């Protein structure tokens, strides 16, 4: 499981939300 802040970081970097 990935922490929420990490998910948001991935979202920000990949621009896929």
Swiss-Prot record:
Keywords: Amphibian defense peptide, Antibiotic, Antimicrobial, Disulfide bond, Immunity, Innate immunity, Secreted
Lineage top rank: taxon: Eukaryota
Main location (coarse class): secreted
Disulfide-bond pairs as recorded: 11-17
Tissue: Expressed by the skin glands.
GO biological process: defense response to bacterium; innate immune response
Subcellular location: Secreted
CC terms in the record's Gene Ontology section: extracellular region
Sections of the chain in a coiled coil: none
Function: Antimicrobial peptide.
Family: Belongs to the frog skin active peptide (FSAP) family. Brevinin subfamily.
The name this protein goes by in its record: Brevinin 1Tc
Native source species: Rana temporaria
Lineage: Eukaryota, Metazoa, Chordata, Craniata, Vertebrata
């Amino acid at each position: 499981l990935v922490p929420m802040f990490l998910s948001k970081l991935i979202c920000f970097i990949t621009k896929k939300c």
